[in-house]
């Protein structure tokens, strides 16, 4: 029986899969574990009553497991690992924090209006550290196999690449060869393409935050 999962609909296009990296993380987990699922698209700008009844906080993703609705991508991924242990996506503890500061650094730089506030350099250092990690331990975060760390990181890298190029005319430095190889491998993969929002929806999704900062 397919699991039901509520995910973000594209801004301005309620019938199209949206751009939430946390939703994509869960969808990628389901894809990697080959767990059948059906998606319910939620317009976060006009949340339907049925959605607020199952999750009063109004956040996505939310997934129905054993007749219970579960929120929060960290919690969901943990439950999926317990319920569907094969293939294992457990990240070895020594690699669990790889890239954990990347997304906050990206958001600070993206929304910054001061070119001298250090946010660009902070993001550069995070990307550099990830590139060096992949050089030493790749091709994936934990070596030769895909783990939960990859499935959390890759959707965020997708947003970083699209949003910064559009809003800041900023690209991930070409010198980060291992990082570029990593994203190229993932972004062209069938499961990633199936579960990612379109480029224009990523841009629309960030526009409000950028313009209001």
Annotate the PLM regions.
Residues 1-141, 145:
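GST-like domain detector, emphasizing the conserved glutathione-binding G-site
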Residues 40-46, 194-202:
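Acidic carboxylate-rich catalytic motifs and surrounding loops in phosphoryl-/glycosyl-chemistry enzymes
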Residues 117, 165-174:
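Acidic, serine/threonine/proline-rich low-complexity intrinsically disordered regions
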Residues 120-123, 172, 179:
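Hydrophobic packing residues in well-ordered alpha-helices of helical domains and bundles
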Residues 127-131, 161, 187:
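Structural signal for well-ordered, non-membrane alpha-helices
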Residues 144-166, 178, 186:
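GST superfamily/GST-like fold recognition
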Residues 174-200:
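A contiguous, mid-protein "functional segment" used to position or interact
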């Amino acid at each position: 029986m397919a699991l039901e999962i509520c995910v973000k609909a594209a801004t301005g296009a309620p019938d199209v899969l949206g751009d939430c990296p946390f939703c994509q993380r869960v969808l990628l987990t389901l894809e990697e574990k080959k767990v059948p699922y059906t998606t319910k698209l939620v317009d976060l700008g006009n949340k339907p009553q049925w959605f607020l009844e199952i999750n009063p906080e109004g956040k996505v993703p939310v997934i129905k497991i054993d007749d219970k609705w579960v929120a929060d991508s960290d919690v969901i991924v943990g439950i999926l690992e317990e319920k569907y242990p094969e293939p294992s996506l457990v990240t070895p503890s020594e690699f669990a924090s790889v890239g954990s500061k990347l997304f906050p650094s990206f958001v600070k730089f993206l929304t910054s209006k001061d070119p001298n506030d250090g946010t660009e350099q902070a993001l550069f250092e995070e990307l550099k550290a990830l590139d060096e990690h992949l050089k030493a331990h790749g091709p994936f975060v934990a070596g030769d196999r895909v783990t939960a760390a990859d499935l959390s990181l890759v959707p965020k890298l997708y947003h970083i690449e699209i949003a910064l190029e559009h809003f800041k005319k900023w690209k991930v430095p070409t010198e980060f060869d291992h990082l570029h190889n990593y994203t190229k491998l993932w972004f062209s993969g069938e499961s990633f393409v199936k579960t990612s929002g379109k480029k224009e929806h990523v841009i629309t999704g960030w526009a409000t935050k950028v313009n209001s900062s």
